Amino acid sequence: MRYTTAGESHGPEEIAVIEGIPAGLHITQEDVNAQLARRQKGYGRGERQKIETDTVTFLTGIRHQKTLGSPITLNVHNDDHNNWSKIMAPNEPQTSENSLRKVLRPRPGHADLVGGIKYRHHDDLRNVLERSSARETTMRVAVGAVAKKLLAEIGVDVHGFVVNVGPAKSDLSTLTQYQDLEALRQVTESFETRALDAAADKAIRDVIDSTKRDANTVGGQVQVMATGVPVGLGSYISADDKLDAKIARAIVGINAFKGVQFGGGFDNAEKYGDQVMDEIFWRPEKGFYRGSDNLGGFEGGMTTGEAIVVRGVVKPIPTLYRPMQSVDIDTHQDHRASIERSDTTAVTAAAVIAEAMVAIELAKAVLDKFDADNIDRMKEQVAAYRQEVKAF
């Protein structure tokens, strides 16, 4: 399985093409739209979300709600393009009229300046920010929706939530009270902040509100969990086959993510071995299992069968309504950075995007290990493999 996305933030369309999805997977546009709606929601989002109503169109690879095994093309229309059609026009030369929204003062923390240098966009840094914008993650969430449908066929569930926004934190000790991810999902999705509890929801709202009043932005952390994952996805044979490494790359590849950890993560660096390693047990009814999950579901780059636990660090959004020091790329004179429409925080949406990326990497790993031509054959192979693992 592989995919690619295309599209600019204020261009007419966002597009994704997915290859390698087995034939016979049942999927509807509503399945994808539900995930796109989750991405748009969240406390602290900006005015763009009031303009867009993200809905997907299936262009290729799906017939009668079933995948064909051929490339799947997904399309989401940018409603805001109506306000930018002249500025983003692909078939018109640049004029004074369609250059009104030039960006010449790069934002610290954004791709503006380095992207302009790299691609020689001397005249307008909008050529950078239109693609580097997090609007592109719309299509990663759409691809993730397809991946989640595939994973659900073999009993794998994936869910993301917010750990903290600034100093306001969810109470992670409450995670033990949930029987499964569906029960957890019902709680976190009931809050606009995607927090774990009502107290954290209120605290996070307060932080976001005060940050907005200060014309500032704020970061945080999100956590993604996956259950029902077969043992042995990934490999210890080569470094680039390690599944945790692939997931780490996928998480840090999301806009504004600056760190990732598995299980106990960086806290494990302050502990001793007998406090960290997940002891091994065996029971005839379930086979091998671990007594804890401090390593986040991975050993040697392979899944252990325990819950995958991944956390990502999200930096504050670089666009500030109280802009920071910058330099005009034309005059080289000091100026305040450009201002683009932005969110106070994207952490609430980041949980959904990170969830999608974990689902994509897990789906890739499943399709690497099992039959990728037909969904029923894949399910048969996974079921047989689970029995083999249990009997080991």
From Swiss-Prot:
Its EC number is 4.2.3.5. GO terms for biological process: amino acid biosynthetic process; aromatic amino acid family biosynthetic process; chorismate biosynthetic process. InterPro entries: Chorismate_synth, Chorismate_synth_AroC_sf, Chorismate_synthase_CS. One of its GO terms (molecular function) is chorismate synthase activity. It holds the Pfam family Chorismate_synt. Gene3D superfamilies: Chorismate synthase AroC. Keywords: Amino-acid biosynthesis, Aromatic amino acid biosynthesis, FAD, Flavoprotein, FMN, Lyase, NADP. Its cofactor is FMNH2. Reduced FMN (FMNH(2)). It catalyses: 5-O-(1-carboxyvinyl)-3-phosphoshikimate = chorismate + phosphate. Belongs to the chorismate synthase family. This reaction introduces a second double bond into the aromatic ring system. Homotetramer. This is Chorismate synthase. It comes from Leuconostoc citreum (strain KM20).
